[in-house]
A protein has these predicted regions:
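Short, low-complexity N-terminal tether/leader segments at secretion or assembly junctions of large
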Residues: 1-43, 223-236
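Extracellular and organelle-lumenal recognition/adhesion modules and their flexible linkers in secreted
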Residues: 34-340
Length: 340
């Protein structure tokens, strides 16, 4: 009897194209059970922008590369809470060509709680908008190791419902979810974030992720942190430096202003020079502006920010009572922070 079933070996590459298939020719009834599964999809193609953690690869360090404070913003979007004596957080560089952590990351974060810490150290990030992950099954993944011993690594997740919103809701908290070794390992944890149904959500809400470090003076290294809506962990999502920087600049940006007063007009008495700075990326909210390294070549005495929006701010520079000469330079560095 002639065979009527067509097997894959009967079809050459490119022989059947989408244009050859009638509408609805292939639907779920024609697919065998488990022909398409999450695991199989994870083994093939990955969705873009699936990682809700910003700067999980620790590529962006706008504020510097070494920190010793107890409550410091360190690598972009990462806030450290430490309670020991002389804690430290530093940027470390992978050996070129290493294969312990896949996809050739360049940097990782090293944390040390310092001496005599009284509680776990914390490496924190807030994912903007509590509704984004509410009610979803997510998988948290991280690569980590310790300089010595087998210290614990934990995870806390809670929902913050913003200004005037419902009270914080702890999704999970475990100080010893994983055990580190002196070799890089990938750790994962899957959990369903609580639904926000019935909650009041105010401004600046977020889902908080806290990596909890054992309270000892051992160096602990972390890399490639990812949070995705998935029942399993997929390989870390790589983004270009420019993509990651732009995402970080929604919350923090640094820049400078330099300008010159009129080259032909001398001003007497009190006078102010006015200029504006535009942000490269629209901020999450109107940011806090901090000025530094203010400089002028004439009698300006007071720098004041004004008209701060999510896209720009203005700077008024007041002169002293003696006035200013023509054509003098004014400059300042600035930072704009709109972190959660």
């Amino acid at each position: 009897m002639a065979r009527t079933t067509i097997r894959s070996e009967d079809i050459t590459a490119g022989q059947v194209k989408s244009a050859d298939l009638a509408s609805d020719a292939v639907d779920t009834a024609e697919l065998a059970n488990d022909a398409v599964t999450v695991a199989k999809m994870n083994d093939s193609a990955y969705l873009a922008n699936r990682n809700y953690i910003i700067n999980g690869n620790f590529d962006i360090w706008q504020r510097g590369t070494s920190f010793t404070g107890a409550n410091d913003w360190t690598a972009d979007r990462w806030l450290i809470h430490a309670n020991g004596t002389s804690p430290s957080t530093t940027q470390q560089t992978f050996t070129p060509g290493q294969t312990d952590v896949p996809n050739f990351p360049k940097y990782y974060l090293r944390y040390n709680a310092g001496t005599s810490p009284v509680d776990v150290g914390e490496v924190n990030q807030n994912v903007e908008d509590v509704g984004v992950l509410g009610g979803k099954e997510i998988t948290f993944s991280i690569w980590a190791k310790a300089a010595s011993g087998t210290p614990d690594l934990g995870l806390l997740i809670y929902q913050n419902f913003g200004s005037g919103g419902s009270a914080n809701n702890i999704v999970m908290s475990d100080n010893s979810l994983w055990t580190l070794s002196t070799s890089w390992q990938k750790f994962t944890h899957t959990v369903t974030i609580d639904s926000i149904t019935g909650k009041t959500v105010g401004a600046s809400s977020y889902t908080h992720f806290r990596i909890k470090m054992a309270h000892d003076a051992i160096n602990k290294d972390i890399s490639q942190v990812q949070v995705e809506v998935s029942p399993t962990a997929t390989p870390f999502e790589h983004k270009t430096y420019g993509q990651e920087l732009a995402a970080c600049q929604r919350y923090y940006e640094k820049g400078a202003m330099h300008w010159r007063t009129s080259p032909s007009i001398t001003w007497g008495g009190n006078y102010y020079a006015y200029n504006t700075a535009s942000f490269k990326v629209t901020k999450r909210a109107a940011p806090t502006i901090v000025l530094s390294n203010e400089y002028t070549t004439d009698g300006y005495s007071d720098y004041n920010t004004a008209d701060i929006t999510t896209d720009e701010f203005a700077l008024n520079v007041d002169s002293d009572s003696s006035g200013v000469s023509a054509g003098w330079w004014i400059s300042t560095d600035w930072t704009a922070e709109a972190e959660l």
